[in-house]
């Protein structure tokens, strides 16, 4: 059941369909207006949501470089996806022209190479940084409403991936909480859970059922040499999805993001 990826799911998961300006000619202006109006209210109001839901960390160049706006847009996309439970918002084309700056409450940079000395000016500019951004809750709510989405503020169910992996060397393994041979996959899954604010509960070795109280997502990941990546297929409550030619990080984002989309109130994608 899990050795084939549905044809509609091939390629990168979570990609939004291109925005067609002819369908909603005023949407870009509407979103821009929402950003400005929401920022005024958002900066004045204390957030009632956990910081985890309104904060994202992305890679960026040195502080002050011209790439800050794209980095802020990436961070905003992650937060919108996390707050709504719709992973498609990460790559929503409608966000491409927006400036997220008015919604930023605070931000900070972390030098990834902090223990390595600076060698020259060029090296300084080329050093990678992690940019952590916290956005205003009121502004996020307004923006999600303009995008046809709602905030997912209630308790989130624990997700228990019940997965088999076939590695590049042909070795088969189950993804469990206590097998040291799947440390890399487990770390990628943990990162995906944090990205979408979905708690993860892995089974122990030998378990044939999900941990108590968790929602099981069945599936498998197979390394496919011709695609130079992982082909993954998942199933939850009779609904299936997947991804192909993916890294482990991308495959587990597809798993957790797809589960969030199906488990959020109302389930499924919001109407466009």
Residue ranges, per PLM feature:
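N-terminal secretory signal peptides that target proteins for export/translocation
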Residues: 1-22
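C-terminal/domain-edge helix-coil "capping" segments
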Residues: 70-74, 78-85, 135, 144-156, ...
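N-terminal Sec/ER secretory leader and immediately downstream segment
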Residues: 53-99, 107-111
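N-terminal segment of the mature soluble domain
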Residues: 73-95, 155-211
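Amphipathic beta-strand/beta-sheet edge segments enriched in Tyr/Trp
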Residues: 54-57, 132, 136-137, 211-258
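Signal peptide-directed extracytoplasmic domains
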Residues: 92-163
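Bacterial N-terminal signal peptides
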Residues: 28-38
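A short, hydrophobic beta-strand-centered structural micro-motif
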Residues: 101-116, 161-163, 195-233
